[in-house]
A protein has these predicted regions:
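Bacterial N-terminal signal peptides
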Residues: 7-15
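Short glycine/proline- and aromatic-enriched beta-strand/turn motifs that initiate or cap beta-hairpins
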Residues: 21-71, 230-246
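Short coil turns and loop connectors of transmembrane beta-barrels in diderm outer membranes
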Residues: 22-26, 71-73, 117-122, 172-176
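Transmembrane beta-barrel strands of outer-membrane/channel proteins
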Residues: 28-36, 77-83, 126-132, 168, ...
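Extracellular loop and loop/strand-boundary signature of outer-membrane beta-barrel proteins
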Residues: 46-53, 91-100, 147-154, 224-228
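Short sequence motifs at beta-strands and strand-loop junctions characteristic
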Residues: 54-59, 99-106, 154-161, 230-234
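Gram-negative (and chloroplast) outer-membrane scaffold detector with strong preference
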Residues: 65-147, 239-246
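Predominantly the C-terminal beta-signal and adjacent terminal strand-loop region
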Residues: 173-246
Length: 246
């Protein structure tokens, strides 16, 4: 599913809402929060250099969110931008430094179920979504053995994933709500890929793409082909979003 399809879905939702009766509500908002790497997306910079994890630490996340309230459930869509980074030693000996940074652009949509609480100023919700992720980044090596010093781009790749979320909607006024939520996002559950963009087989080439699949040329003791297993990447987002009814 490409982002254009999801954006088209959001446009259709807006058209439906503009012609719907009073039982349908529409809200649009923007928010920010933190993004925590989970699974193989976390770890230390030494893990990244060794090819076992990506070694990222907690970063930030921004989003634009649309919520359409329908009888019995809610349909939610959004666009997110997240950034994660880390820096530290490349090896346990302390030789060399690594700085790794990755950015994630996400387009997502899915259903949401609200749990009304009579006379309460807040409404809990549970939801799920299908998401398209575009992932890119940079890696900087300084004084590291087996790779040249410098900054190398991590080529842009896309992955289809899904997320599960929960939160509460706090009513601030007749047309304004505060949405406090958390989402666990699975970024690459369906597709993993090993991609070498250079014809050479030097170690540094392995860091020039996401390369979340096992290196097909992996061999014990081979310092150029060192990624021994596929890596599953996920993240936890905790967000505060101001929603305005239209």
């Amino acid at each position: 599913m490409k982002p254009a399809y999801l954006l088209l879905l959001l446009c259709i939702i807006v058209l439906v809402v503009s012609n719907a009766d009073s039982q349908v509500t529409f809200q649009l908002g923007a928010g920010a929060g933190i993004r925590l790497p989970m699974g193989d997306y976390s770890g230390e910079t030494m893990d990244y250099y060794a090819g076992t994890k990506y070694g990222l630490s907690t970063g930030y996340n921004f989003q634009a969110k649309a919520r359409v309230g329908l009888p019995g459930f809610t349909l939610v869509g959004g666009i997110e931008y997240g950034h994660l980074s880390n820096k530290g030693d490349a090896e346990a000996s302390g030789q060399g430094r690594v700085e790794v940074a990755q950015s994630i652009v996400t387009v997502k949509a899915g259903p949401e179920i609200t749990i009304p609480l009579p006379a309460a100023p807040l409404t809990p919700y549970l939801g799920a979504n299908v998401a398209w992720h575009s992932i890119s980044g940079t890696t900087t090596f300084t004084g590291v053995s087996r790779v040249p010093s410098g900054t190398f781009d991590v080529g842009v790749v896309s992955r289809i994933g899904f997320g599960i979320n929960a939160g509460v909607i706090i009513k601030l006024g007749p047309m304004m709500n505060l949405d406090l939520g958390a989402e666990y996002a699975f970024l690459n559950p369906l597709t993993k890929e090993w991609k070498i963009t250079e014809t050479s087989a030097n170690r540094v080439d392995s860091y020039k793409s996401l390369n979340d699949e096992k290196d097909p040329l992996y061999a014990v003791g081979n310092t150029d082909h060192f990624v021994a297993a596929a890596r599953s990447i996920s993240s936890l987002q905790v967000m505060a979003t101001l929603m305005i009814g239209l």
